[in-house]
Amino acid sequence: MSVTDPIADMLTRIRNAQQVNKAKVRMPASKLKRAIARVLVEEGYIQEVKEDVANGHPVLDLTLKYYAGAGVIAEIRRVSRPGVRVYRGAEDLPRVRDGFGIAIISTSQGIMTDRAARSAGIGGEVLCVVS
């Protein structure tokens, strides 16, 4: 079965797994999902990412992060969707929770946080926000 929005599917899998205190979550892999997972690891929202093969297809195994029994991710939400794409210039990139969260941006130089895109002076598609 094909998924209309693979990024929304990834975020939903992470959100659902964290709500039931799962240690790991597995999902189909893609270049974009790997890049988003890398940003989440760098920013400390998930513990680690491993790549595996299941039934001949590449999959990502994400190890979720918890603090005092609660998930580190309070909110993870898709912004730009297939039906309504959201593009912002460097000066208009969203500030999530006054800098305590991140927005993940797809730019011409790759996937990065809003802070990195702002400091590089480039805008792009606002994929999701995490706090």
From Swiss-Prot:
Gene Ontology cellular-component terms listed: ribonucleoprotein complex; ribosome
Protein origin, superkingdom: Bacteria
Swiss-Prot/TrEMBL GO biological process terms: translation
Signal peptide stretch: none
GO MF annotations in UniProt: rRNA binding; structural constituent of ribosome
Keywords: Ribonucleoprotein, Ribosomal protein, RNA-binding, rRNA-binding
PANTHER family from the UniProt entry: 40S RIBOSOMAL PROTEIN S15A (PTHR11758)
Similarity field: Belongs to the universal ribosomal protein uS8 family.
Function, as annotated: One of the primary rRNA binding proteins, it binds directly to 16S rRNA central domain where it helps coordinate assembly of the platform of the 30S subunit.
Subunit structure: Part of the 30S ribosomal subunit. Contacts proteins S5 and S12.
Record-linked NCBIfam families: PRK00136.1 (NF001109)
Protein name (Swiss-Prot/TrEMBL): Small ribosomal subunit protein uS8
Native source species: Acidithiobacillus ferrooxidans (strain ATCC 23270 / DSM 14882 / CIP 104768 / NCIMB 8455)
Recorded name of the encoding gene: rpsH
